[in-house]
């Protein structure tokens, strides 16, 4: 046996006798390399038995080198294998212990799949998701849901009423059925104004002899009117815009004014009238703009020039908050009341002077009440505290759950009419929530970011529910919510598609308009390459407005409509039947609105980069600079220069260019790098909120879209005043406006630049 083993071992190395040679590492003085040859003991025994003298044989160099090469190869293979194996074990050691080296390759592979916690579903692409969304929407009957929400079960549903709460609970249950990640409610205690159950609001003509001629005890009312009694001359002021008041040939000082509904909000009409020293306002729907058959139709609205609970300005209306009594500066100090067209025509019968042709108004319109007559207005509205509920459901993102898009709709309404005002938006909200729930649970859609669906109430009192939620999370919401999509009043007609949005969303909306087809003519919604110039500014009565102007969150609102206003909003005729009569293709129109909103949601939550085009504000800043350049002489006369404003605008342009370059150079698969870039993009809108005014005193701090002396439009208006009436111009105010606007723009540029060491400090 020993002979066989020795023979096999010997043959492995070419049949040569084995010897090991040790070479000295030190070079010998005489140039020789000494070595020691060692023979195996078995060889020595064999030589001794055969009585043969061992002779030293020189090993063959070729076979020796082959031996060392083989050994080296084996060693390197083992080192590489062990390094890789130990590295793998280290990665998964938290899950389970390393597998033994002796296990098969198949076992290693199967255990690798078990221990790696990586989603196995394939990622759907934009084209796949568009098709999937379209197919889902095709199977839904939106009109049935709108009809259900417009029935007596849920109407009338004034904010805080029993039927409003019943609808809130229904929506909450629906969200639970959709298997959302979380469903919750937000509770507030707010003060709203309602008609008195004791006294009536009244409009009366006071004859010269003191006799009273009753005109109307209106069914409708205007919330947040000053409850008081006034009497005076009555004059017409068209729509009640600032321009309308400026163009009047008679004074409104100490007079009641009557204005048409439309063009601007009730609150703006009242504020304008108050600024021209009017003592009260009457609002009606004229026949030309609102061709409604019923002349005695009542109208509802509110007069708060702001949003949220006006008795807790700047802070949320949570129960038992210990704030001192206060009220919003946007509340009017004069009474305001809506009247029917029949009542307005009765008043016109006592008035004189034809209305200007440029007003494009019906012939019954008159300008001033006859001499020796007055109109008496009595408003007896009362404040009520109501508990209101906002309902939320969230689909959490799979990569960045702490970043979310909010999709919301108002569910309440003043009066019995609810269809176009709140049922369409609420129905669309529910169906979109259902569609996205199905896409995730059944079709493999994995949004990177979260989607929050929100049902607001008290929207008819000035986006109270939405604003109170924003006020409750003012310090943190802008760091997490990056877009608000408003679904209110999305279908009022078929002819036009109108958009109101933050400039950050213009580019994305343009792409979606090119994708989505109009259901009537089959053409793209993108009809005009110059559509951005026709984008309308968000109004006070739009729930998207406080998101943009108060919280600095990009927001978008859109609708299908006609050239003329929808005639039934704010009236009891806003019914499902009236809506389907005006919009026979209601189901197709709402489905198209759902496709627009759905594509927005997908693009904002699916793509690696946030689809917010921060470069669009470059054109807005450039437009502002052009407006300001018209007053270069005035500015120079005050010893001022626009140099620093130019510099701030230039820094913003350079910051956007650098950010675009950073994005193009970034490794898109590196989530940490992309998150850092997206965080910089998210800061843009928020940093356009002026940091130099109080959110309590001036809640709408956005220098482009806000309201107050800190806005860029107010700065320009101040310069116009200097040219018109220099004695009324406040130079100190203007200097502050210019300085603070400059530093606000510079702050946005700095935020876009990223880390503090990347900011150009040579301002």
Curated annotation (Swiss-Prot):
PA domain residues: 225-315
Entry-listed glycosylation sites: 104, 253, 319, 725, 730
Residues carrying Phosphothreonine: 21
Membrane topology field: Single-pass type II membrane protein
SUPFAM superfamilies per record: PA domain, Transferrin receptor-like dimerisation domain, Zn-dependent exopeptidases
Alphabetical GO biological process terms: acute-phase response; cellular response to iron ion; cellular response to leukemia inhibitory factor; cellular response to xenobiotic stimulus; intracellular iron ion homeostasis; intracellular signal transduction; multicellular organismal-level iron ion homeostasis; negative regulation of apoptotic process
Modified residues (Phosphoserine): 10, 19, 24
Cytoplasmic side: 1-67
List of residues that carry Phosphotyrosine: 20
Extracellular side stretches: 89-763
Span of the annotated motif Stop-transfer sequence: 58-61
Function: Cellular uptake of iron occurs via receptor-mediated endocytosis of ligand-occupied transferrin receptor into specialized endosomes. Endosomal acidification leads to iron release. The apotransferrin-receptor complex is then recycled to the cell surface with a return to neutral pH and the concomitant loss of affinity of apotransferrin for its receptor. Transferrin receptor is necessary for development of erythrocytes and the nervous system. Upon stimulation, positively regulates T and B cell proliferation through iron uptake.
Subunit structure: Homodimer; disulfide-linked. Binds one transferrin molecule per subunit. Interacts with SH3BP4. Interacts with STEAP3; facilitates TFRC endocytosis in erythroid precursor cells.
Protein name: Transferrin receptor protein 1
Organism in which the protein naturally occurs: Mus musculus
């Amino acid at each position: 046996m020993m002979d066989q083993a020795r023979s096999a071992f010997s043959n492995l190395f070419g049949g040569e006798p084995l010897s090991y040679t040790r070479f000295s590492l030190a070079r010998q003085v005489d140039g020789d390399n000494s070595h020691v040859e060692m023979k195996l003991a078995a060889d020595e025994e064999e030589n001794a038995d055969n009585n043969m003298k061992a002779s030293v044989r020189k090993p063959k160099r070729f076979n020796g080198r082959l031996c060392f090469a083989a050994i080296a190869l084996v060693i390197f293979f083992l080192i590489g294998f062990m390094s890789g194996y130990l590295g793998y074990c280290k990665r998964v050691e938290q899950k389970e212990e390393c597998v033994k080296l002796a296990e098969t390759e198949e076992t290693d592979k199967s255990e690798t799949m078990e221990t790696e916690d990586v989603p196995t579903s394939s990622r759907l692409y934009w084209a796949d998701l568009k098709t999937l969304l379209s197919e889902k929407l095709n199977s839904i009957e939106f009109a049935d849901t709108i009809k259900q929400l417009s029935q007596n079960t849920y109407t009338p549903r004034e904010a805080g009423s029993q039927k409003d709460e019943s609808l809130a609970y229904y929506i909450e249950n629906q969200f639970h059925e959709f298997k959302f990640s979380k469903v919750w409610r937000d509770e507030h205690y707010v003060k709203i104004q309602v008609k008195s159950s004791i006294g009536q609001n009244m409009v009366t003509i006071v004859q010269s002899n003191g006799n009273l001629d009753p005109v109307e005890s209106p069914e409708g009312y205007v919330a947040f009117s000053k409850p008081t009694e006034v009497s005076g001359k009555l004059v017409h002021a068209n729509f009640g815009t600032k321009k309308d008041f400026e163009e009047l040939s008679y004074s409104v000082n100490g007079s009641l004014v009557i204005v048409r509904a439309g063009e601007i909000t009730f609150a703006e009409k009242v504020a304008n009238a108050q600024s021209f020293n009017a003592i009260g306002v009457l609002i009606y729907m004229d026949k030309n703009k609102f061709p409604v058959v019923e002349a005695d139709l009542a109208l509802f609205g509110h007069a708060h020039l702001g949003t949220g609970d006006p008795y807790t300005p700047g802070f949320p209306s949570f129960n038992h908050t210990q704030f001192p009594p206060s009220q919003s500066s946007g509340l009017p100090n004069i009474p305001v009341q809506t009247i029917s067209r029949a009542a307005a025509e009765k008043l016109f019968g006592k008035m004189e002077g034809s209305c200007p042709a440029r007003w494009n108004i019906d012939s019954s319109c008159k300008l001033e009440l006859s001499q020796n007559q007055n109109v008496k207005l009595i408003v007896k509205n009362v404040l009520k505290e109501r508990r209101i509920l906002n309902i939320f459901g969230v689909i959490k993102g799979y990569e960045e759950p702490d970043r979310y898009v909010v999709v919301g709709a108002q569910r309440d309404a003043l009066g019995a009419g609810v269809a176009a005002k709140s049922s369409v938006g609420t129905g669309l909200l529910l169906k979109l929530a259902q569609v996205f729930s199905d896409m995730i649970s059944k079709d493999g859609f994995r949004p990177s970011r979260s989607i929050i669906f929100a049902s607001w109430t008290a929207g008819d009192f000035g986006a109270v529910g939405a604003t109170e939620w924003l006020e409750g999370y003012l310090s943190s919401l802008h760091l997490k919510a990056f877009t608000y999509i408003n679904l209110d009043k999305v279908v009022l007609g078929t002819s036009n598609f109108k958009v109101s949005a933050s400039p950050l969303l213009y580019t994305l909306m343009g792409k979606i308009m090119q994708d989505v087809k109009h259901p009537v003519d089959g053409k793209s919604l993108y009809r005009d390459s110059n559509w951005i110039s026709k984008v309308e500014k968000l109004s006070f009565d739009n729930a998207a407005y406080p998101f943009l102007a108060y919280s600095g969150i990009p927001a978008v609102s859109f609708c299908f409509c006609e050239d003329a206003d929808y005639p039934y909003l704010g009236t009891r005729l806003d019914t499902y039947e009236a809506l389907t009569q005006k919009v026979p293709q209601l189901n197709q129109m709402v489905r198209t609105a759902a496709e627009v909103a759905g594509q927005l949601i997908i693009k904002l939550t699916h793509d690696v980069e946030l689809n917010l085009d921060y470069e669009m504000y470059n054109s807005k800043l450039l437009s502002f600079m052009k407006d300001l350049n018209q007053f270069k002489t005035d500015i120079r006369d005050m010893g001022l220069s626009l140099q620093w404003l130019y510099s701030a605008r230039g820094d913003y342009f350079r910051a956007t260019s650098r950010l675009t370059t950073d994005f193009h150079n970034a490794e898109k698969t590196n989530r940490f790098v992309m998150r850092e870039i997206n965080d910089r993009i998210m800061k843009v809108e928020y940093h356009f909120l002026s940091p130099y005014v109080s959110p309590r005193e001036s809640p709408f701090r956005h220098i482009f879209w806000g309201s107050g002396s800190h806005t860029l439009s107010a700065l320009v208006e101040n310069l116009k005043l200097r040219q018109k009436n220099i004695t009324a111009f406040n130079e100190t105010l203007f200097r502050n406006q210019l300085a603070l606007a400059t530093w606000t723009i510079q702050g946005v540029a700095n935020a876009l630049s990223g880390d503090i060491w990347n900011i150009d400090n040579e301002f």
